[in-house]
Amino acid sequence: MNTTTYIGDCRISFFNISSQGFWDNLKSPDVVFGYSLPLLEIQIILIFFCIVMSHMFLRCIGISQIASYMIAGIVLGPQLFDVLEKSSGKLSVDPALDGIAALRCISVFGTLMFTFLMTVRTSRRVAFHSGKLPVVIGIVSFFAPLFGLGFQNFFSDNIDPHYMPLTKALGERTAIVITQSSILLPSTTYILLELKIINSELGRLALSACVINDILGIFSMIVASIQATYIHVSHATAYRDTVAVIIFFLVVFLVFKPMVQWVIDRTPEDKPVEDMYIHAVIITALASAAYFVFFNMKYILGPLMIGIIIPEGPPLGSALEAKFERLTMNVFLPISITFSAMRCDGARILSQFNDIFFNIFLTFLILVIKLVACLAPCLYYKLPLSESLAVSFILSYKSFADFVLYEAVLDDTYISQATYSFLILYSLLNAGIVPTVLRRMYDPRRKYVNYQKRDILHLERNSDLRILTCLHKPENVSETIAFLQLLSSPNLDFPIAVTVLHLVKLVGQINPIIVSHDKKLKRLNKDSYIHTANLAFRQFVLESLESVTVTTFTAFSHENLMHEDICTLALDKTTSMIVVPSGRKWTVDGLFESDNTAIRHLNQSLLDRAPCSIGILVDRGQFSRKSIVTSKKRYIIDVGVLFIGGKDDREALSLVKRMKNNPRIRVTVIRLVFDHEIESDWDYILDNEGLKDLKSTEDNKDIDYIERIVTSSVEVVKAVQLLAEEYDLMVVGRDHDMTSQDLSGLMEWVELPELGVIGDLLAARDLSSKVSVLVVQQQQQRT
């Protein structure tokens, strides 16, 4: 059956839909499968049972869930259960409709919805705003594999006429070249998300090149469909279809697009789009599929074009995602992929191996050509070899999205069942092998490895202090400005360069973007919290008498990949410290309110990857409020540094030393000394060197220095709790000398491991103090 006639399968049925159940006929209970609904239900149950069982084993070896969908289809195919063949004769009441028609309709609907939603979530700006390299890769990777058409006549004398007539066999080779030359956006996006590199520069490059390639592919698909109609149907029909496509484009761009913009404009900010408009968009996407089917083209082209028109992100794109993504991704897409794989017949590959051997050779030849076509521009533009190879493998990845093309050419009888089965198995091998190869080949954390010191301890005395601050919510603004006020001063000897990064969870789109607020940002209006925050930082710069410079950015990113944007920006701005909120929220009275798990996970990722030092700020409210009052009145803010020892404590001390010129704060360094410390230990020597200027009253007049002797972990806890009552802000290192039994015993009770032992004590829920905490970790040296 032709792919383009799937939507036409919805017709009046002349058989019963629902049965009376198994108990209606105990002698022949399988008669229940002569009814369409029970048959469909058992097919879906079998599909998801096989998916779950497959994934139980595959996830143990790190294989993605998409491979489980494919394997489930192969298990249910002719090799084992042959569900399609056994189902096709069940609805004998009406032989015109076999037992797989309903399942096929669900499969096509899943493909249609997935394609539409994926296109809606893809930013069209990413294709033309990433420089020349992705454009070159997209164009070269589209045209270069087509040189494989020059090999289609090789060994044509060996084609068995019993397998396929000569003309048709050559057409099969052409279909293989065209399908293998394509780079489909869903496949590229999926592997980037699976590898968690979609936020990286390499991920953005691959996405941009893929979008360029897809744009060329859409137009070539339309031209190919019209050409096929011109050759195989009639000239008049081809001309009619051409006019129909032109009319469709005009209606979409001149009518539908303005209507979509009108819906977006009339939807108030932070208000959902009315359901009426969402349903109208979905109906339009379905109608566009039927429109293209009627005019002899692939049904997938309609939803593609409608999806391109709809702007990604809120309000409409995010509303469509919220309403339909889970159902599509968790129900319809697995059925669609499994159904396509169920048509794979491995026995045909073996029995007709000699007939399809050249097709297999052609497939791998196109793979090599595509790898070279992607690799060459990357090397020409001086991309490292490992990253160039990674881009090439990503753009050569074949997966579930390609099933649409394979089914189309199979149903149009351009390829044989044996060739189709090989292409399905080839995609399965891709899904299992390519991600594993890429993980070994490209580690995104490698680019954060710094061979230069990027911390505060090793900064020259009067050199710039570069800080990157991250904001998640409106309440983060006041605490961040309060912290920066401690470092700023009218008589400052060193300038401070602050980069502010607003982190926004990506909804309704795939492509992460970082936007500079030096440029005009249309997506923000004057009522948004980001706009208000930017005004607050601008006022802070004016109050600091321009001793501080502030640059602001907004990162629209996936929640579990935000660390990529933060680390990349920190590298670009050569920052010495990243300051992030802790995720723990307090009431106005200083009582515990909630923990944000997503922010905590982000902070942990930053601690593992950050290319510089990092500070985690826990604000109980009093510190930020007092800082605001202090800027207007002559109140003093008490800052305490708890020093136990180790590189993180030395980094915290270096940070606080840069606050000593601020007349509005009073700094005290409290050193906890253990009675059994080894004075010959290297860390102990470095600690004393860092504290030497504080111990001398002649050299140090701005910072108070206190030493307290402790003998056990119990005394450490008591000392920390007492100190928390005396200061507005405590600055502590994250890690200390954990070989000491006095601290290692406390690790068992830590609730927030990202804050370390002392930071966790000061941020404890049951601590009655209102002290805020800054936990500092010095830049980690990795190899």
UniProtKB/Swiss-Prot annotation:
Keywords carried by this UniProt record: Antiport, Ion transport, Membrane, Potassium, Potassium transport, Transmembrane, Transmembrane helix, Transport
Primary location group: membrane
Tissues with expression: Specifically expressed in pollen.
Gene Ontology MF terms: antiporter activity
Keyword Transport assigned: yes
Membrane topology: Multi-pass membrane protein
UniProt keyword Ion transport present: yes
InterPro entries, sorted: Cation/H_exchanger_TM, CPA2_transporter, Na+/solute_symporter_sf
Subcellular location: Membrane
Single GO biological process annotation from the record: potassium ion transport
Purpose: May operate as a cation/H(+) antiporter.
Protein family per UniProt: Belongs to the monovalent cation:proton antiporter 2 (CPA2) transporter (TC 2.A.37) family. CHX (TC 2.A.37.4) subfamily.
Protein name: Cation/H(+) antiporter 10
UniProt source species: Arabidopsis thaliana (Mouse-ear cress)
